[in-house]
C-alpha cells in the first residue's frame, strides 16, 4: 500500500510567500529575490513531504498567485490587453492578477471567482485570440527538475484540459472553437515534453467532472481525452477529481485509457456506491481520497480502514490519498502553543495529514494490530464538552413566524424612504477602512495584555473619529465606523461568541497574498454579551448622518469557519443566527437605523449539483438569514453584502432573504449580473459595486460615471446604491480617499442629469 497527496499549501509555515510577494509589490525586493524565496519554499515543502513518507509527491502545485492562472500562462492564454503592456513575464502575470496602472498602460485585473465550493478564489483566464495558444511556458518542467535535483521523482500536477477549457472566458464562439483545437495540441506537446524528461506520472485535475454534466460536456471530455491519451506513450496519467463524485461519467472512465482514477470519498456522496455498483477496472489504480483536505479534524482510522476494506473487495490497486488539495487547511498544529492539548490532539492540519497517511500506510502494511491504530482510537475518548442545553432549548422553541419579517418589502420601502430621507443614488462603502500598521499593533498589544482595555478603546475611538471625518469630507451619504476593532469579519465574531476555538497560526490562502485564519466551531454557539454595540453607538454619536451597524451573517460565519462534524450544518447555522439576532435587536434599540448583515459567503457551500441546492443548503441557509433580522421594526433598513460568486442562478433565493438593500461584488465580472436582475424583476435595492477594490487601481470620475450610467440603463434609479464592490481594509488610504472622492463626484454628476 502506498500513499499520495493532491497538493500542498504554498504560503509557507509562517506565510513566507505572502510577505515575499508583497515586498516585491512594494518595490522593496527584486524579481530574483522573490523567485529565490519561492524556490526555497518549494524545496522545504518537498523535503517535508518526503520525510513524512509520502510516495507520490506533487510538483507544479506551487503558485505565486493562482494555479488556474499558471495553467493559462503555461499555454499562453493571455488577453491582448495584458500583452500590449509589454511587461516582462512576471509583471505580466501580476498585471493579470491585480491589474496595472503605470507608464505602460491602465488595465483591470482578471475576474475572480470561488474555486468550486471552497473559500479559495481563482482568476478567470480570458481568451480573445486563440491563435496564440501554445505551450510557451516552462514552469511545470522547471519545478519537476527542481524536485529531481533533490532526488525526488515527483508527480507533476496540472489542471486538466476539460476543466481549464470550461473555466476560460472566451471572446466569442469562433475564438472558443479554435481554442479547443489549439489547446488540445498544446496538451499533446506537454505530454511529449514530459515523456522526453522521462516523467513517470502526471496528475490531471478535473474537478469540473463533479458538476451535473450535460451530454455536450461528456462529449467534449471524451473528444479531448480520446485524442490526448493516444499520445501518452510511457507517461502514466492520473485523472484526479475532488469536491464530489463522478456519477455522470464513472462507467465511461472505467473503459478509458487513464492509468489511475482519483476519487473523493469525503465529499463524493456516491463515490463508494459507484465502485460498489460498477466495480473498478483491473488495469487502473484507485487513488482513494479518504483524508479530508478541507476540514481540520483528526482522521478516525477505524472509519478509514473500514472504507479501504470495502474498496479492496473491488480492487487491490489502491493508493491512499487526500480528498482534495491541502491548500484549504492550515500548515501545521506545531505552531499552536496556546490551544489546550485536549482540543489540539483532535486536529490535523496539512503536515499532520501527511502523518495520518503515513500511519494508515503502516497499519495496512503490518499484519498484527498496530499501536498507531490504538493511539488514534484513544484520541476520541474524553472529548471536551460541546453541548449547551440552553441553546438546544432555544432552537426547539422557534416558531414559523420567527423566520418571517413583516410588513412586506414594498410597505417597508415606503416607511424607510420617509424615515431615512436619503438622496437618489445614495453613496456608501461596504464596511471596513484601511488597517494601517498602528491599528494592527494596537490590537496585538491588547491581545498580549501589553496595554489596558481603556487604552485600546481610546485608540480605536480616535481612528473611528478620523474615519467618520474623512467620509463626511468626501461627502458619502451613509457612513461606516471602519471596523478598526476587527481582525477579520468572521474571526472577530467568533472570538466574541461562545462555542468557537481559535488558532494562532492557522492561516489559509484565500487568493493571491490574502490569507485568512478561520475559526473552529467546536461547541454549541451563543452570545454572552453585546459585541459591536459600543462601537456603533460611539460612531453614530459623532455624526448627524446615518452610520451603519456592521455584522457578519450566520451562513458566512459557518462557511468561513471549520465546521463541526458531529451535528448538521443547519443546526450549527441556526445557533449562530440566534446569536447574531440578539446583536441586531440591541443595535436597533440603540437607535442604529441601518444594519448591514454581510453574507459574503452565501454561495460558497451551495452543492455543486443543482438537484441538491435546495434540500441540502438553500432550504435552511435562507431561513437562517431571515431568523437574524425578522424581529426588527419596518423602519430599520437591513442591508447585506455578497462577495465574488456567480449569483445569476440563485437570485430568486437571494430575493427571499428579504433584505432591504443588497450590495454585490460585481465590478470584476463587468456587471453582467445586471441583466439577470432586470430579467427576474429583482425587488431588493442593489449596490452592484462600481469599482474593484482588490486592485490598487484608482478609477477615474469618467470611468465611474460610465459604470453608473450602465447600471441606470438596466435598473430603476430608485433601486440603486453606489458603493465600491467590497470592504476597503486591504487598500492604502491614499487610494481609498481618491477613489471615494471620484465615486461621489461621479454620482453627483449623474444626479444632476436625472
Swiss-Prot record:
GO MF terms, alphabetically ordered: 5-methyltetrahydropteroyltriglutamate-homocysteine S-methyltransferase activity; zinc ion binding
Positions of L-homocysteine binding: 430-432, 483, 598
Pfam families: Meth_synt_1 (PF08267), Meth_synt_2 (PF01717)
GO biological process: methionine biosynthetic process; methylation
UniProt enzyme class: transferase
Residues given in the record as L-methionine binding sites: 430-432, 483, 598
Cofactor: Zn(2+)
Enzyme Commission code(s) on record: 2.1.1.14
Annotated family: Belongs to the vitamin-B12 independent methionine synthase family.
Function text: Catalyzes the transfer of a methyl group from 5-methyltetrahydrofolate to homocysteine resulting in methionine formation.
Protein name listed in UniProt: 5-methyltetrahydropteroyltriglutamate--homocysteine methyltransferase
Organism of origin: Campylobacter jejuni subsp. jejuni serotype O:2 (strain ATCC 700819 / NCTC 11168)
Gene name as annotated: metE
Amino acid at each position: 500500500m502506498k500513499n499520495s497527496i493532491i497538493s500542498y499549501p504554498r504560503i509557507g509555515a509562517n506565510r513566507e510567500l505572502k510577505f515575499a510577494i508583497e515586498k516585491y509589490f512594494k518595490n522593496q525586493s527584486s524579481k530574483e529575490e522573490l523567485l529565490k524565496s519561492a524556490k526555497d519554499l518549494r524545496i522545504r515543502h518537498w523535503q517535508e513531504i518526503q520525510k513524512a513518507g509520502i510516495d507520490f509527491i506533487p510538483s507544479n502545485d506551487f503558485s505565486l498567485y493562482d494555479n488556474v492562472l499558471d495553467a493559462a500562462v503555461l499555454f499562453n492564454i493571455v488577453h491582448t490587453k495584458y500583452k500590449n503592456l509589454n511587461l516582462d513575464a512576471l509583471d505580466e502575470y501580476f498585471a493579470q492578477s491585480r491589474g496595472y496602472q503605470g507608464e505602460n498602460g491602465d488595465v483591470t485585473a482578471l475576474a475572480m471567482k470561488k474555486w468550486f465550493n471552497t473559500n479559495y478564489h481563482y482568476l478567470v483566464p480570458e481568451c480573445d485570440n486563440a491563435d496564440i495558444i501554445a505551450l510557451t511556458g516552462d514552469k511545470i518542467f522547471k519545478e519537476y527538475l527542481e524536485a529531481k535535483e533533490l532526488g525526488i521523482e515527483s508527480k507533476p500536477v496540472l489542471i486538466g484540459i476539460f476543466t481549464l477549457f470550461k473555466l476560460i472566458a472566451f471572446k466569442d464562439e469562433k475564438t472558443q472553437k479554435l481554442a479547443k483545437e489549439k489547446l488540445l495540441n498544446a496538451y499533446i506537446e506537454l505530454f511529449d515534453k514530459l515523456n522526453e524528461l522521462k516523467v513517470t506520472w502526471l496528475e490531471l485535475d478535473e474537478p469540473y467532472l463533479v458538476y451535473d454534466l450535460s451530454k455536450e460536456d461528456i462529449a467534449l471530455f471524451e473528444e479531448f481525452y480520446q485524442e490526448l491519451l493516444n499520445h501518452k506513450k510511457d507517461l502514466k496519467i492520473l485523472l484526479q477529481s475532488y469536491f464530489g463524485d463522478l456519477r455522470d461519467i464513472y462507467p465511461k472512465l472505467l473503459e478509458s485509457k487513464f492509468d489511475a482514477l482519483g476519487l473523493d470519498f469525503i465529499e463524493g456522496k456516491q463515490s463508494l456506491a459507484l465502485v460498489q455498483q460498477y466495480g473498478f477496472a483491473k488495469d487502473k489504480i484507485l487513488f482513494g481520497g479518504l483524508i479530508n483536505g478541507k476540514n481540520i479534524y483528526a482522521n478516525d482510522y477505524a472509519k478509514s480502514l473500514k472504507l479501504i476494506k470495502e474498496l479492496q473487495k473491488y480492487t487491490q490497486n489502491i493508493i491512499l490519498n487526500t480528498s482534495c488539495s491541502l491548500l484549504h487547511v492550515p500548515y501545521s498544529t506545531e505552531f499552536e502553543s496556546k490551544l489546550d492539548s485536549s482540543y489540539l490532539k483532535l486536529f490535523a492540519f496539512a503536515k499532520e495529514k501527511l502523518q495520518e497517511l503515513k500511519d494508515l500506510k503502516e497499519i495496512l502494511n503490518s499484519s498484527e494490530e498496530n499501536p498507531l491504530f490504538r493511539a488514534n482510537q484513544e484520541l476520541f475518548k474524553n472529548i471536551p464538552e460541546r453541548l449547551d442545553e440552553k441553546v438546544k432549548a432555544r432552537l426547539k422553541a422557534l416558531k414559523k413566524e420567527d423566520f418571517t419579517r413583516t410588513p412586506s418589502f414594498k410597505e417597508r420601502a415606503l416607511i424607510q424612504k420617509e424615515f431615512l430621507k436619503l438622496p437618489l443614488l445614495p453613496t456608501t462603502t461596504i464596511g471596513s477602512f484601511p488597517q494601517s500598521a498602528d491599528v494592527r499593533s494596537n490590537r496585538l498589544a491588547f491581545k498580549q495584555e501589553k496595554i489596558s482595555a481603556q487604552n485600546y478603546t481610546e485608540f480605536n475611538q480616535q481612528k473611528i473619529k478620523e474615519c467618520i471625518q474623512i467620509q463626511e469630507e468626501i461627502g458619502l451619504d451613509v457612513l461606516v465606523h471602519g471596523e478598526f476593532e476587527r481582525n477579520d469579519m468572521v474571526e472577530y465574531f467568533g472570538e466574541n461568541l461562545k462555542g468557537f476555538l481559535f488558532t494562532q497560526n492557522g492561516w489559509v490562502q484565500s487568493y493571491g497574498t490574502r490569507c485568512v485564519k478561520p475559526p473552529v466551531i467546536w461547541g454549541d454557539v451563543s452570545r454572552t454579551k453585546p459585541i459591536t454595540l459600543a462601537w456603533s453607538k460611539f460612531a453614530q454619536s459623532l455624526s448627524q448622518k446615518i452610520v451603519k451597524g456592521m455584522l457578519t451573517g450566520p451562513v458566512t460565519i459557518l462557511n468561513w469557519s471549520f465546521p463541526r462534524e458531529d451535528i448538521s450544518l443547519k443546526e450549527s447555522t441556526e445557533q449562530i443566527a440566534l446569536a447574531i439576532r440578539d446583536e441586531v435587536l440591541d443595535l436597533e434599540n440603540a437607535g442604529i437605523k441601518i444594519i448591514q448583515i454581510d453574507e459574503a459567503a452565501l454561495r460558497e457551500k451551495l452543492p455543486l449539483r443543482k438537484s441538491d441546492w435546495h434540500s441540502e443548503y438553500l432550504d435552511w441557509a435562507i431561513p437562517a438569514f431571515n431568523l437574524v433580522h425578522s424581529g426588527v421594526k419596518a423602519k430599520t433598513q437591513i442591508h447585506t453584502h455578497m462577495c465574488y460568486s456567480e449569483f445569476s442562478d440563485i437570485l430568486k433565493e437571494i430575493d427571499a432573504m428579504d433584505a432591504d438593500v443588497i450590495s454585490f461584488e460585481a465590478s470584476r465580472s463587468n456587471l453582467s449580473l445586471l441583466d439577470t436582475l432586470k430579467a427576474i424583476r429583482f425587488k431588493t435595492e442593489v449596490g452592484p459595486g462600481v469599482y474593484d477594490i482588490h486592485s490598487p487601481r484608482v478609477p477615474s470620475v469618467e470611468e465611474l460615471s460610465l459604470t453608473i450610467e450602465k447600471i441606470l440603463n438596466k435598473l430603476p434609479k430608485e433601486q440603486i446604491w453606489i458603493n465600491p464592490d467590497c470592504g476597503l481594509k486591504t487598500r492604502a488610504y491614499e487610494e481609498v480617499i481618491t477613489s471615494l472622492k471620484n465615486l461621489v463626484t461621479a454620482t453627483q454628476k449623474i444626479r444632476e442629469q436625472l
